[in-house]
Swiss-Prot record:
CDD domains associated with the record: enolase (cd03313)
Function: Catalyzes the reversible conversion of 2-phosphoglycerate (2-PG) into phosphoenolpyruvate (PEP). It is essential for the degradation of carbohydrates via glycolysis.
One GO process term, biological-process aspect: glycolytic process
Active site positions: 204 (proton donor), 336 (proton acceptor)
Tagged with keyword Secreted: yes
Protein name, UniProt field: Enolase
Listed PANTHER family: ENOLASE
Catalytic reaction list: (2R)-2-phosphoglycerate = phosphoenolpyruvate + H2O
EC number(s) reported in the record: 4.2.1.11
């Protein structure tokens, strides 16, 4: 049957060469699930805690403590349970941890087990993962938000914003959307090289040129879109992840690249001007994670013109999301499985968002793996949007390739989300 008979955790490496947790789950009927846990560089203060060893190995970043929790306490607690009862399994691990932020056993330990259990249950029923999680109604292929220029803590340059994304809103399918993105990515590489900029890539596969402002980065992207024969705003839109918490201090936003300091009102005005000047349809973390006043002002100013996404603000946490909904802050939530630490809590956050009319965007982390779980999750939740990096690095492409496969599997039932921003 679908009874858990063994759980094996191990320490492996992520896309940055840092340790992460991998978990194998075996069921009584021979079914098997394996999951790898991602890790962020730009992390919100309110995220669940990933447990690191803090010793000399891997400069303190080892995860042997989290692995020991998987192979010890968690196995003892979950052995003999039914893998199909995801909520009960996740709740049992949360209770076992006993802390509000999963700090004792580690969110990385809990998440690895939670995702591997879901994969094993899907395998036992001979179902694709997206179908097992999402049921028969899972059929929407997400519009990809492709991060082709990296800045902030994701790159060694002076750009303060963390991500500049192209969004193929006018593509007829996810396969074609990925083609659009790849063509623009390579066109951008050529333009950067011709202009004398380095074309090395950052953590998420995007280029990391020594630009000093957001306008400069967007202008290069716009030129690359046009060079490929696509129409900005009609076929390709633009998205930003400001990651504003990273340059927010004492009530102001400090732009090292521009050498400017903006107060809350000036930050809002600056973002509003960018939306007016370019086909920007989504802005993530335009204000800092605890700048609720700024978030409210930003939402009131451009929330009807642009998707306002809370990442560090909401950290995939249903309670923080409910607070934001009550305050009228933001209109979308970024969903990162490791911010909360279990699959069932992740799905709950998506449900809370959808019930309130907020959009949800399934997202990777800067420290990724070859695990393509989030591609299936995006389809399972019918959320219509996914962030999984640029068109380089196999840890990013694993998700894009899985979306192509899922679209093929769904056949005539598949529907590409496309332009959901209007």
């Amino acid at each position: 049957m679908t009874i858990i008979v063994d759980i094996i955790g191990r320490e492996v490496l992520d896309s940055r060469g840092n340790p992460t947790v991998e978990v194998d789950v075996y069921l009584e009927n021979g079914a098997f699930g394996r999951a790898l846990v991602p890790s962020g560089a730009s992390t919100g203060a309110h995220e669940a805690i990933e447990l690191r060893d803090g010793d000399l190995r891997y400069q303190g970043k080892g995860v042997e403590k989290a692995v020991a929790a998987v192979n010890g306490e968690i196995l003892e607690e979950l052995g003999g349970r039914d893998a199909r009862d995801q909520i009960a399994i996740d709740q049992a691990m949360i209770a076992l941890d006993g802390t509000p932020n999963k700090a004792r056993l580690g969110a990385n330990a809990l998440l690895g087990v939670s995702l591997a259990v879901a994969k094993a249950a899907a395998d036992s029923l001979n179902l694709p993962l997206y179908r097992y999680i999402g049921g028969t109604q899972a059929h929407i292929l997400p519009t990809p938000m492709m991060n082709i220029i990296n800045g902030g803590v994701h790159a060694d340059n002076l750009i303060d914003f963390q991500e500049f994304m192209i969004i193929p809103v006018g593509a007829p399918s996810v396969k074609e959307a990925i083609r659009y993105g790849a063509e623009i990515f390579h066109a951008l590489k050529k333009r950067l090289k011709d202009a004398g900029y380095n074309t090395n890539v950052g953590d998420e596969g995007g280029f990391a040129p020594q630009f000093k402002s957001a306008d400069q980065a967007i202008d290069f992207i716009m030129e690359s879109i046009i060079a490929c024969g696509y129409k900005p705003g009609e076929q390709i839109a633009i998205g930003l992840d400001c990651a504003s918490t990273e340059f927010y201090k004492n009530g102001s936003y400090f732009y090292k690249g521009e050498g400017k300091c903006r107060n809350i009102a000036e930050q809002v005005d600056y973002l509003a001007q960018l939306v007016k000047s370019y086909p920007i349809v989504t802005i993530e973390d335009g204000m800092a994670e605890d700048d609720w006043e700024g978030w409210k002002l930003l939402t009131d100013t451009i929330g009807t013109k642009c998707q306002m996404v809370g990442d560090d603000l909401f950290v995939t946490n249903s309670a923080r999301l409910r607070d934001g909904i009550k305050m009228g802050v933001g209109n979308s939530i970024l969903i990162k499985v490791n911010q909360i630490g279990t699959l069932s809590e992740t799905l709950d956050a998506v449900e809370v968002a959808h019930k309130a009319g907020y959009r949800a965007i399934i997202s990777h982390r800067s420290g990724e793996t070859e695990d393509s779980f989030i591609a299936d999750l995006a389809v399972a939740t019918n959320c219509g949007q996914i962030k999984t990096g640029s068109l380089a690095r196999s840890d990013r492409l694993a998700k894009y390739n899985q979306l192509i496969r899922i679209e093929e599997m769904l056949g005539s039932q598949a529907r590409y989300a496309g332009d959901i921003y209007r």
